Amino acid sequence: MVDDVSSTLVTTSSTTYISGLSGFDSSALIEAAVQAKLAPAYVLEARVEEDEAVLSSYSEMASLLETLEDTLNALRNEPGTLSDPSVFESRAAYLSSDDSSTPGNYFGVVVDENTEPTSYEIQIQQLATAHKISSDRQSSETDALGLDGVFSLGTGSSSADITIAADMSLEDVRNAINDSSDKSGVSASILQVSDTEFILVLSASETGQEISLSSVSGEDIAQNLGILNTDSSVKNELQTVQNAILSVDGVQVERSTNSIDDLIEGVSLDLYGANQDATFTLELDYSYSDVKEELLAFVDAYNAYREFALIHQDVDSSGNVSEDAILFGDDVLRGVNNSLYDSLNDTWDVDGVTYSLGSLGITFDSENALEVDETVLDAFLLDNIDVVAEMFEFQYESDDENLMVLSREGQIASGSYALDISVDGGGDITGVSVDGDDSLFEIDGNTLTGVAGSEVAGMVFVFTGTESSTVNISFSQGFADSLYNELDEYTNVVDGSLTEAKRAREERVSNATSEISSIESAAAAEEDRLITYYANLEAKIAVANALSDYLDAITSSDD
């Protein structure tokens, strides 16, 4: 008979089991077995931690490269009909005067993108004015006028009928006119000229338009109010109507408005004041400040990436890799660095002269970061901005506007070609050749795609012409477009090598996380099994010990 079983409750991993009777340290045995099961998970967790550090670095790298690409985009001429043009297509108006007059006090200018650079001599002789007339003086603005009739009010070809009743005051007449101002082009206001005198003021909404009034029925309201004389002429004219008059390069022109957008192609003028004594020079040219701003933004974006790259290449004097160099030896990082180095050290021939970034005052420092001599840059932009445009942006010329660039990608060879394009009755291209070679393009409807490996690879054209013709084209890629496309091979969200490297790491982390979960589940199951096993073993030993003690007791009593 077992009088008592001595035991100890032991808790491991939130599971309680019996220990202490057998002399075995079952807790240690279970822990050792569980740790052996978990050992592969610890290896995987360490790898996941490393992979997540790499992924974080990849994300930072992608962000820095995307910022760099944004600056290149502004300098390259982004492909596509709906895309933003490069900064080299931006235009600015530069104003000066032949005397001390400040041009901005007399007119403002807005210039459309890609407007042809040129200059004009402008004189502003008079501004366009809006017609303004008034009634005779009235003794009250609130008393009933006692007038009953309908009159027509308008400007140009627009008019509205205004109905006046006998109980209406001067204020009511004003309100009735303003209720129809959108239709008539005339607004009304009341001017108090003394303590007891008021006049109704009629103002044309647009300059260069004369106000017209005529009686339609009933009393002649305009004559009774003193707006018109009995011969229907204007009685009280506060401001005459006149056109704007200005001369451009000695040619006098008139407009009915002070906002003029049909005088110089691509240019909108807003006239603020007349000055017959001053001649203003309007120069349309590249927006030098915008170009410089984008070039400096490119330098800043490159230097930000360069700082990142240096951190991940850092090795101390003993040859030990820095803990922060997460991407040390990474193929993607090495590839991007090589692409940038090669591109930034390239040269470009423009009109037989070879240029580099150094020509613009953009050079490398001792750490291979870019630095800018702004004095050199300013001078080069001022004297050679067209050269900078050719250096940086994709440029395309065609003698037929029906052949347009639809898209482009990759590294594109510069060249000039005469395309013999054959078109059927439905407008589809049936053939295209260059100097008799018909193997350069693939044809799909009215789309031409440069064959891979050919000198026109990467180019896609669309032809909207309806007749067969020969089209002469030329194109050159430029530094910004070339480097953008190189970086896109890494950052492209579909198949860029950086994107694919991130995707592979993410998949490895996902697989490892799943495997860790499986290992932990298996280890937990093994722990439960061992706990049960040792608990049963302890119980059996306890019973055996109790039986042994009982037998010893019987034997002793027999003695």
Short names for language-model regions:
Residues 513, 520, 531, 541-552, ...:
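Long, low-complexity, Ser/Pro/acidic-rich regulatory segments
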Residues 45-76, 299-301, 305-321, 326, ...:
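Contiguous, amphipathic alpha-helical segments that mediate oligomerization or scaffolding
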Residues 193-198, 311-329, 333, 529, ...:
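Acidic/histidine-enriched alpha-helical segments
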Residues 1-49, 70-199, 203-304, 308, ...:
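Bacterial flagellar/type III secretion structural subunits and associated motility module proteins
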Residues 65, 136, 264-265, 316, ...:
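Short amphipathic alpha-helical leader/targeting segments
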Residues 59-60, 129-137, 310-313, 542-552:
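Short amphipathic alpha-helical segments with coiled-coil-like heptad repeat character
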